[in-house]
Regions:
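Sec/Tat signal peptide C-region and signal peptidase I cleavage site
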Residues: 11-15
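Hydrophobic alpha-helical transmembrane segments of integral membrane proteins
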Residues: 5-6
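Charged, amphipathic alpha-helical interaction segments
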Residues: 9-10, 32
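A cross-kingdom marker for long, charged
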Residues: 16-87, 91-331
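N-terminal export leaders
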Residues: 1-2
Length: 331
């Protein structure tokens, strides 16, 4: 069974998460140690800064230190920081986003730059609360360790433009293609009433709903309830969820599986909007009580994907922080 939320509790089996928190802090400290004073000043931002919550996936100026500004050893230390949270598939997802930025650079010019992906650290590594972000065009990974025993990894956004590379040395590359294929398998395997329950709109939405500052627009979960699926159908939905949730380091995934059992995966719903014809605009999502995974492919002739994993209570470690401040008011 897959994870249902991004907030990772210690609980009785907390040793793995304790190790993860220490590993992440050590990787962040090593990264900081590789920087000179000027670079360190660019990277370090107060945890309380509004910027920590100001995530986005459009090409824009960002705080932090870009990969393009780093020396080779610094870029290696940054990658080790990413690897403290992500597994190999997760790292390949980051690489794929930047590869596609290179494809766009060839088509559109230097405005597109695989080096313009920025690392920011919020607070002091190992001293709660603290966290970090890796962000650029079509990528936003937000890691927060708000209190001892909590790790949040959302919002986690990945985009793919082009969704399918149509020419050049990377022709045929589909960064998020497996997600679309799984979603189409799910829809193809439904009977008529299940398909009608899953279809929430005849046209795609044109964008993810839970974009920055808009997560409330999602409302209550809609679509086909997973409790009504048979085992094979549910396995496909879980495999679809795993395209995001399964990108984390093994110990973090293990903690998420415990969380999933608490939340109950049967309460999730699968929804589709738009055309079922390959190559045409479509949207789908898996939405539970607090967790949502969205995928929209509408722009540029349905060759431009926006996908996101949100935890609607634990993004940025918010619920852990709120609980902490209730218990220990800060003046």
């Amino acid at each position: 069974m897959l994870a249902a939320a991004a907030l990772l509790p210690f609980g009785a089996a907390s040793a793995q998460t304790v190790d993860a928190a220490q590993r992440i802090a050590e990787a962040a400290t090593r990264f900081l140690s590789s920087l000179d004073d000027g670079q360190r000043q660019k990277v370090l931002i107060a945890f309380e800064s509004d910027n920590r919550l100001d995530w986005h996936y459009i090409p824009r100026n960002r705080p932090g230190l870009s990969l393009g500004e780093m020396r080779a050893n610094q870029a290696e230390a940054a990658r080790a920081l990413f690897a403290s949270v992500l597994n190999q598939r997760g790292l390949e997802l980051l690489d794929g986003v930047r590869l596609l930025e290179g494809v766009l650079r060839e088509q559109q010019g230097s405005f597109r730059d695989p080096g313009r992906y920025y690392v920011s650290l919020f607070g002091t590594p190992g001293r709660f609360p603290w966290g970090w972000r890796f962000e650029g065009h079509h990528l936003s990974l937000n890691v927060a360790l708000p209190v001892a025993g909590r790790i949040s990894v959302t919002p986690f956004f990945v985009g793919a433009h082009p969704a399918t590379v149509r020419d050049g040395p990377n022709r045929g590359f589909r960064l998020l293609g497996t997600s679309e294929d799984l979603a189409r398998q799910i829809m193809a395997g439904l009977n008529d009433w299940q398909r009608q329950a899953a279809l929430i709109a005849n046209r795609s939405f044109g964008e993810i709903v839970a974009s920055p500052q808009r997560e409330r627009d999602l409302g209550e979960p809609r679509g086909l309830l997973l409790a009504g699926l048979d085992g094979a159908q549910r396995n496909l939905v879980e495999a679809l969820m795993d395209r995001f949730l399964g990108t984390l380091a093994p110990d973090l995934v293990a903690a998420q599986k415990r969380r999933a059992l608490e939340q109950g995966i049967s309460a999730f719903r699968f929804a589709w909007a738009g055309s079922l014809t390959p190559g045409e605009a479509h949207y789908f999502r898996v939405h539970g009580p607090v967790t949502v995974i969205e995928h929209d492919n509408t722009q540029n002739g349905a060759n431009h994907i926006h996908a996101v994993w949100r935890d609607l209570t634990a993004d940025f470690g918010r619920d852990a922080l709120a609980d902490h401040y209730r218990r220990q008011p800060h003046r």
